[in-house]
Amino acid sequence: MRGSRLPWVLLIAISAFGYGSGPLFAKWIYPTGFDWLDLLAWRHLLAALILWVVVLFLPAGRAALRQITPRRGLTAFGLGVLFVANASTYFGSLTWIDASLAGLMTYAYPAIVAVLSIFFAHAPSGVRPWVALAIATSGVVLGVGGISAGKEPALIGLVLGVASPIIYSCYIILAARLGGESKSGTGASRGGGIPPLAAVPLSLAGTSFGVFVLRLATGRDLLPIPIPDDALLPILGVATIAGIVPIGAFYAGAKRLGAARAALVSTVEPIFTIVAAGLVFGERLTPVQLLGGAAILGAVVVAEWEAIRPTQARRGRGR
């Protein structure tokens, strides 16, 4: 194995935990009178502003921005606009369904990314990732199929919950190609592509622009002002912990691991969401849904065993 994948696997896990905190912040924000579109407006504006300040302050950030062509810069901006559709359907679904269920439904996307990668990106090699993908997909099916008949969620919530991973899968493949990935290899192995320090702030700017257009198109003000006092800290959290951190970490990790493998590793996200939602909001899953969560976690272990097992064991096989 050329170098260790473990740091990049951990980076994707950090991204997953960041994204997984999003539903928790949303559940704190919605009771204050803000809805999902208000949340998205502040989330992406604050995330973009904070990250642009950081990137422009860092010499490496300024150097990364100078490397990109106008065409690639516009592509990164356009990807950010596409992300609005994913974020809108996901956070919109939380109006009607539990955060734990939304987290599980989202994880249909690794299977979609894996299929798309066969045609448009670097598909996983060997049998192990595909076996792990089958296990993870089964876990998602168990999670969604374990809905209690006595607490059937609204149809619109389920429709939005299903639409989100489809849109996100397309976003991931396009972002991977922007990072230099193709059918012949990952972005890091092939070289080229937009570095994360340039791609992520441009993408966040595009997302913020897209949210503002959506707000104006629906007859709303550009920004919901004032922010309710009880929503201020959760909004800062959703902009940083559930915004800047996961978007940047996933882009950087996927550039090394490839889109399909990164998507598979990030299936640990619903584990975090489920546990945290249970501890904070008292949400509970059925035993079948818990089994689905265990299957998802096991799938990641199967897929990345070469990266996470003890170093001595790898040396024993000449790796």
Put a short name on every predicted segment:
Residues 16, 42, 102-108, 174-208, ...:
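Helix-helix packing/entry segments at the starts of transmembrane helices
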Residues 1-42, 81, 89, 150-190, ...:
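Glycine-/small-residue-enriched transmembrane alpha-helix faces in small-molecule transporters
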Residues 24-36, 64-65, 95, 144-156, ...:
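Membrane-interface helix termini and inter-helical loops of multi-pass transporters
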Residues 51, 116, 125-147, 276, ...:
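Hydrophobic transmembrane alpha-helices of multi-pass small-molecule transport proteins
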Residues 7-15, 42, 62-89, 156-164, ...:
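Loop-to-transmembrane-helix transition segments
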Residues 29, 39, 43, 93, ...:
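Hydrophobic/aromatic residues within transmembrane alpha-helices
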Residues 18-23, 55-101, 105-106, 142, ...:
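Specific transmembrane alpha-helical segments of multi-pass solute transporters/efflux pumps
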Residues 38-49, 83, 91-124, 164, ...:
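Specific alpha-helical transmembrane segments that line the substrate/conduction pathway
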